[in-house]
Design a protein with these regions (language model features):
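N-terminal secretory signal peptides that target proteins for export/translocation
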Residues: 1-25
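Bacterial N-terminal signal peptides
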Residues: 30-41
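Intrinsic disorder/low-complexity segments in short proteins, especially the signal peptide
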Residues: 13-16, 39, 44
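Short hydrophobic alpha-helices and adjacent helix-cap/hinge residues
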Residues: 2, 8, 43-201
Length: 201
C-alpha cells in the first residue's frame, strides 16, 4: 500500500501553510485532508486497467472545481458498445461505483451512456469517458460543451485532443492533466490552489 499520493500530500502541505497565515479557509484544508486519507487507504493496482484508486482521484478532483457538485450526482459512464476494451471498462467502472461512491460531500451514482447517445443523456452531472472510443471522443467534447458538464478519464490522449476536460493517473504516482480549452468550453474552472498542483495543456 502506498502512502499519501504526492500531489495531494503537497496540496495538504500547502493548505497547512496557508491556513496558518489565514490565507485559506478550513473547508479547503479539510478537502485536502480527506483526499489524502481516502487515497492512502486504497491498495495499489496489480494491473493496467482502470482501478478503484483512479476512480477515487477522479471523484476527489471534481471537488476542486470552482462550483463543485454536492450530494447525489449521476455520472455518465461513456462507452463504445462495439469496442471490447471500452465496454469492459464501463462494466468495471459501474461495479466500482456500485450504488454510489461517496467522496467528501459528493456521491457519484453510475449511469451507463452509449457514446452515440451521449447527446441525449439526461440528468448527468459529469461524464466519465472510457478508453477505446477513439475518434468518437469528439462526440464527448460536443456534449460537454452543450451541457456545460465536466468530463474525466484515464485516457490521457483524449484530454490532449480536447475531447475530455481532465485525465488522471494514480500509479506510479498521482498525476492530473487538464485541457484548459476543453475546460473553458465546458464551463469548468478549478480552485487556484489545485491548479498549482496539476498539469494544464
Amino acid at each position: 500500500m502506498n502512502s499519501n499520493p504526492s500531489i495531494f500530500k503537497n496540496l495538504r502541505a500547502t493548505a497547512e501553510s496557508q491556513a496558518r497565515s489565514g490565507a485559506i479557509n478550513a473547508q479547503f484544508f479539510g478537502i485536502c485532508s480527506l483526499i489524502a486519507a481516502a487515497l492512502a487507504a486504497v491498495p495499489a493496482p496489480a494491473r493496467a486497467d482502470v482501478t478503484a484508486k483512479d476512480v477515487q482521484v477522479m471523484a476527489r478532483a471534481l471537488g476542486f472545481t470552482e462550483k463543485p457538485p454536492t450530494g447525489e450526482v449521476n455520472i455518465g459512464i461513456v462507452f463504445a458498445p462495439g469496442n471490447a476494451q471500452s465496454a469492459k471498462e464501463a462494466t468495471d467502472l459501474q461495479a466500482m461505483l456500485g450504488s454510489g461512491l461517496k467522496a467528501g460531500n459528493l456521491t457519484l451514482k453510475p449511469v451507463m451512456v452509449k457514446i452515440d447517445e451521449i447527446g441525449a443523456a439526461g440528468d448527468v452531472g459529469a461524464f466519465l469517458l472510457t478508453e477505446g472510443v477513439g475518434a468518437d471522443g469528439s462526440k464527448v467534447a460536443a456534449a460537454t460543451k452543450s451541457k456545460q458538464k465536466p468530463c474525466v478519464t484515464v485516457d490521457i490522449a483524449q484530454v490532449q485532443s480536447g475531447a475530455c476536460v481532465m485525465g488522471v493517473k494514480s500509479e506510479p504516482k498521482v498525476e492530473i492533466v487538464v485541457n484548459k480549452a476543453a475546460a473553458a468550453d465546458a464551463g469548468v474552472s478549478f480552485a487556484a490552489s489545485f491548479r498549482m498542483m496539476i498539469t494544464e495543456l
